[in-house]
């Protein structure tokens, strides 16, 4: 499923896979003990997500990725997935983080529309800049 979705999203594939294939990519994340989830609609897979409940960078949960089948894009699946992951984490955590390459403005905009707020920029060990975003998980008082 991940390989199929990666092929359908070449920008994401280039950014995330680099020169790896899907299997090597998943293996590279195995040390983080995160959760890969396949999301279905009417019994058919339409999306894949990855999140960590605890990241070594700050001890907090992080959203790694959400990939949607192109035939199912713009139907609210990604927002629903982010909300479901938020609900899973809400009992134990107050916020969830995400890191996006700074030049991927459309990804930053989308996460902002899903309740993430821009927190800061950071550079990785290779000097690449990332926007770090945070999404409050506590339910708003009514």
Curated annotation (Swiss-Prot):
Ranges of residues in domain N-acetyltransferase: 1-138
Highest taxon, organism lineage: Bacteria
Pfam family, one: Acetyltransf_1
GO molecular function: acyltransferase activity, transferring groups other than amino-acyl groups
Protein name listed in UniProt: Uncharacterized protein YkzC
Family annotation (SUPFAM superfamilies): Acyl-CoA N-acyltransferases (Nat)
């Amino acid at each position: 499923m991940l390989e199929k979705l990666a092929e359908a999203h070449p920008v994401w594939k280039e950014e995330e896979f680099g020169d790896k294939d899907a299997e090597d990519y998943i293996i590279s994340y195995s040390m983080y003990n995160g959760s890969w989830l396949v999301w279905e609609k009417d019994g058919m897979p339409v999306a894949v997500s990855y999140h960590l409940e605890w990241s070594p960078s700050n001890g907090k949960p992080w959203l790694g990725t959400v990939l949607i089948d192109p035939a199912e894009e713009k139907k609210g699946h990604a927002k629903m997935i982010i909300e479901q992951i938020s609900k899973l984490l809400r009992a134990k955590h107050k916020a969830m983080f995400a890191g996006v390459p700074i030049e991927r403005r459309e990804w930053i905009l989308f996460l902002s529309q899903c309740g993430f707020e821009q927190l800061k920029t950071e550079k990785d060990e290779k000097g690449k800049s990332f926007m770090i975003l945070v999404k409050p998980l506590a339910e708003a008082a009514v």
